[in-house]
Design a protein with these regions (language model features):
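Charged, low-complexity intrinsically disordered terminal segments
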Residues: 1-53, 57-385
Length: 385
């Protein structure tokens, strides 16, 4: 569904030197008219989406996390940008990443872009690349980025001291089996339930369902200190998710969980936006957790039905007290009153939102239209989000 109408652009990307492109779960019909029938007949299949995010360099290093490739994820959009998180790994995790990539690349879910009916035009692709380079030279939003090749020696010098020792492994949905979206939820719950003292979760889209509530209840009864940060309606880019998250707020808090929601005007916007860009608000896109100050999860998986049963997802589980300490500091900063609302219950068990400046008794929002959309999307089955 995400590549509707993009055949010419995809064909021209494929035509560029040294680039090979494959599409996950593509349309079988290339004609727009025929796709209407395909959508009716195969909507369940077409709704399956590859949500994994992975970069591998020379088979030796990998970057993975929640970040897509787009302006919103790199602080370059004038409307809003995302606070997101990745991890750079060298060693065994990079080897795992190579294996995962090969499984996807060779799976029956992928098709080569060469199968597109639009014929690639190498000259048109080259001209488009030249135009893009010329546009980028003058693009206001790219002022902070070098146009010409740069020596990155100083950046590499800062990188090495920031690396943390640890052991880890990759977890991901098994596309080789022909089934997707069936394994990661159990993996995530097992990670959470290993916590004995403290569990910090930052996740952009949360719809816990009864299984998630049961897990939080069990952890709470064991005395685990649980803190969860997710989006507020005001910081949300997908109000439909908020529509199906909000009925769970009270029950989440009643398990003893400390619940926080991102402020749309969070102070961390200053490190999210890349000057001179200044978005109108900041949203949360991170998917991460720290258990007992030692174990770390960073990946692509949201805690909602779509990630649990429809998307393919992935992540890294890492045993590293030093990395966990770094990430814990970041997560607690993001949960502070300057960056988030703490959602609590008052004496009458009514919800209230408190930040560093004020307490309010209705969920923060950016405007009346958000409130309308929040109501409208309640009629859409939560399993789609």
């Amino acid at each position: 569904l995400m590549t509707m109408g993009q055949d010419p652009a995809l064909a021209n990307i494929q035509a560029l030197p040294n680039i090979e492109l494959r599409l996950f779960n593509p349309w079988k019909q290339r004609n727009l008219g025929a796709r209407a029938g395909e959508m009716i007949a195969e909507m369940e299949r077409l709704n399956s989406r590859m949500h994994d995010k992975l970069i591998i360099v020379d088979g030796r290093a990998t970057v993975l996390g929640g970040r897509n490739i787009g302006d919103h994820y790199f602080g370059l959009n004038e409307n809003y940008n995302f606070h997101d998180l990745d991890v750079l790994a060298i060693g065994a995790l990079a080897a795992d990443a190579n294996g995962m990539f090969d499984e996807f690349w060779n799976s029956e879910w992928l098709a080569s872009a060469e199968q597109l009916t639009t014929e690639p035009d190498p000259e048109k692709a080259r001209q488009g690349w030249v135009r893009l380079q010329l546009r980028n030279r003058d693009a206001r939003e790219l002022e902070s980025f070098p146009v010409d090749p740069k020596n990155w020696g100083s950046e590499w010098a800062m990188l090495e001291p920031a690396l943390r020792p640890g052991t880890g492994y990759l977890v991901y949905d098994d596309v080789a089996s022909g089934e997707i979206g069936q394994g990661m939820l159990g993996t995530m719950f097992a990670f959470f339930e290993q916590a004995q003292e403290e569990l910090l979760i930052t996740n952009a889209y949360i719809i816990p369902g009864e299984p998630g509530m049961d897990m939080l209840q069990r952890l709470g009864e064991r005395g685990v200190d649980i803190r969860i940060l997710t989006n507020s309606l005001a910081s949300h880019d997908v109000p439909a998710v908020n529509s199906h998250y909000e009925p769970w707020r009270q029950r989440i808090i009643q398990t003893g969980t400390h619940l926080y929601e991102m402020r749309a005007d969070a102070e961390i916007q200053s490190i999210v936006d890349v000057p001179p860009v200044s978005g109108k608000f900041v949203g949360l896109h991170t998917k991460a957790a720290v258990a007992d100050g030692r174990y770390v999860f960073i990946g692509s998986m949201n805690l909602d039905p779509r990630s649990a049963a429809i998307n393919t997802e992935m992540g890294a589980i890492i045993d590293s007290p030093m990395l966990a300490a770094d990430l814990r500091d970041v997560m607690l900063r993001d949960m502070s009153g300057e960056n988030a609302w703490q959602v609590t219950l008052d004496d009458r068990s009514h919800l209230q939102w408190t930040n560093a400046d004020e307490t309010v008794t209705s969920q923060p929002k950016r405007g009346f239209l958000q409130s309308i959309m929040n109501v409208v999307f309640k009629v859409v089955p939560r399993e789609q989000f």
